[in-house]
Amino acid sequence: MKHHSLIFLTGFSGSGKSTIGPLLANSLGYDFIDLDQAIEAITGKSVSRIFAEEGESYFRKLELDTLKTVTNREELIVSLGGGALESNECYTLIKEKGTLVYLKSGSGTLTKRLCHKTDRPLLKSEQGGKLSNGEIEQKIRELLARREPRYNSATITVQTDTGRIGSTVEELTRKINRYVRKTTGNSRAK
């Protein structure tokens, strides 16, 4: 059964999911879970370390298992990892159980936000070293091209590379409440 009060935030790494998610949850009176942080708490390892030691496929299995534990909750905002929708099982579960919201940013904005980050495993060279800004932007474009069809299947999309965080949260709150009103007849997402 689909829960209108189970909201999944998707978007590329650096799009604002972990920053906007808790603020949106507060605005709606919901709880918040960052799926990557939940995986880190369960395993005692950072996402980067899991990728380095166990590989991406192992991480994606952990991601699916962790996702399954939250899909029966309501009044919850879940920040997904940037690649979570690449798993058919994760994608199907998310679309069946809740409302998908895409936080969209362009590759230039994402490059500016991510070029100084060292904890993003998919933005490292094959040998694990740091990429140049040009290489980072190229990798972001490649990953966006692969992921955007699923990102674009979201019920609600908000641009996050323009404007301020507060106005983005207000826009999301309005759009979510409008969607809930339209689909359930309730006046708010509560």
Swiss-Prot record:
Keyword Lyase annotated: no
Entry's Gene Ontology BP terms: amino acid biosynthetic process; aromatic amino acid family biosynthetic process; chorismate biosynthetic process
Stretches assigned to coiled coil: none
EC number: 2.7.1.71
Subcellular location, record wording: Cytoplasm
Reactions the enzyme catalyzes: shikimate + ATP = 3-phosphoshikimate + ADP + H(+)
Keywords from the UniProt entry: Amino-acid biosynthesis, Aromatic amino acid biosynthesis, ATP-binding, Cytoplasm, Kinase, Magnesium, Metal-binding, Nucleotide-binding, Transferase
GO molecular function, one term: ATP binding
Domain of life: Bacteria
A Pfam cross-reference name: SKI
Cofactor annotation: Mg(2+)
Metabolic or biological pathway, per its Swiss-Prot or TrEMBL entry: Metabolic intermediate biosynthesis; chorismate biosynthesis; chorismate from D-erythrose 4-phosphate and phosphoenolpyruvate: step 5/7
Entry keyword Membrane: no
Main location: cytoplasm
Binding-site residues for substrate, renumbered to this chain: 36, 60, 82, 147
HAMAP family in alphabetical order: Shikimate_kinase
Subunit structure: Monomer.
Name of the protein: Shikimate kinase
Taxonomic lineage: Bacteria, Pseudomonadati, Chlorobiota, Chlorobiia, Chlorobiales
